[in-house]
Amino acid sequence: INSPMRLTSIIIMSPEWFLENDDFYDDYDRSAKVFAGEYAAHTTRTTDPVKRNNLESALAEAAFLTGVERNADVVYLASYAPLFARIGYTQWAPDMIWYDGASSYGSPSYYVQSMYSNNNGTYTLEADAEKDYKIYHTQSYDAKTGDIIIKIANPHEYEQRIGISVDDSFDIAGQMSVETLRAIVLMM
């Protein structure tokens, strides 16, 4: 890195804060690289540490990450934290991976991190979204594979139908794959 590095503060806030601040890095000085030291959303609707990083929090983090990725020219590194917590022995919440003496499991935040880290482009693409919908999105292009990667976070409690059109400069003949992270409501 040939630019000065800046460390942003630890951002452990409510899901609402993350949804309202997806543009957090939009106005940063473009001459410096930023390390977003630690970030995590946690709901205040419960005091149970294990339940504080739930789907609501994970979707808010995904929305925030669209802004981080959109500003990849400035945000050089970003780190979810804290990473591990032993069930029943926590100092804080949220945590990405929970464990006890016999097993471990990833929180919804773990799956957001996995989806984002396994779907990276070489550079980001400009995109517009209709203002009628409050969805969070980022687009990138993978020069090695020729893939266009579109990430969309819909933190709302309802589905939204969206249309995607791609600029003529890309040859998009071929197949498309979709990964989703969503809540399943069981009816009893």
Regions found by a protein language model. Give the residues of each.
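Carbohydrate-binding surface patches
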Residues: 134-172, 178
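Aromatic/acidic polysaccharide-binding cleft in carbohydrate-active enzymes
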Residues: 32-147
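Composition- and surface-driven signal marking solvent-exposed, interaction-prone regions
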Residues: 20-22, 48-57, 92-93, 97-99, ...
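Generic recognition of flexible, low-complexity loop/linker segments
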Residues: 1, 21-25, 64-68, 135-140, ...
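Flexible loop/turn segments at secondary-structure boundaries
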Residues: 1, 13-18, 41-46, 84-89, ...
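Active-site-proximal beta-strand/loop segments in catalytic clefts of secreted hydrolases
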Residues: 8-12, 37-40, 80-83, 153, ...
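Glycoside hydrolase catalytic-domain groove-lining segments
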Residues: 2-49, 131
